[in-house]
Amino acid sequence: MDIEEAIYRRRTVREFTAKPVEDNALQRLIDAAIQAPSAMNQQPWSFTVVRDQPLLDRISREAKAHLLSTASAGVTPLQIQNLLSNADFQIFYHAPALILISAVGADAWAVEDCCLAAENLMLTACAAGLGTCWIGFAQNWLGTPEGKASLGLPATHLPVAPIIVGHPKTPAPPVARKVSEVRWVG
């Protein structure tokens, strides 16, 4: 699959088979991620791979509780509050692996650089027949001292992109895209 095909085929996947993702496949995704450009070539990222399902279940519970305790009435939609309150909802969708991309240090564009690495990772996963989903629900709690400690992250690391990876149960259907506003100047 060429890069343009991966761009147009990549979709968020939230339903996975139980088949584990092999170490070499996960390493290949990380190898592609670190090919991303970065400001001043600082490459300010680190990667944490988690396949321990009881740990992912615990992080899911902690992240949901954290989000609910910090949710603002009128700001956090009721639909999201209800989802987070559901004991059966696991924020990682029982995926076989989580790859967390964290920014190392306080470089001015470290977060943006990690986002570029994340897109490389997700496109490479698509090209390899794997599915991914960026789990925004996990970000805030993973950035707390307790969240960092759960994964052995140093205090200087900032969790940016928690991405689940697995073998999709079914092919992701195409999704309509909005027409972008484009301004041509000159």
Model regions: which residues?
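Small-aliphatic-rich amphipathic alpha-helix that forms the alpha element of a beta-alpha
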Residues: 33, 99, 104-149
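Short, surface-exposed beta-edge/turn micro-motifs
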Residues: 44-45, 95-98, 159-160
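Arginine/glycine-rich "motif VI" loop of SF2 helicases in the C-terminal RecA-like domain
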Residues: 126-127, 154-156
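Short, well-ordered beta-strand micro-motif
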Residues: 49-51, 100, 164
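N-terminal amphipathic, basic helical "cap/leader" segment at the start of enzyme domains
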Residues: 1-92, 186
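A generic structural signal for short coil/turn motifs at secondary-structure boundaries
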Residues: 16, 107-111, 172
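C-terminal helix-cap and adjacent tail motif
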Residues: 6-9, 85-86, 159-186
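Short, hinge-like loop/turn segments at secondary-structure boundaries
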Residues: 65-66, 150-153
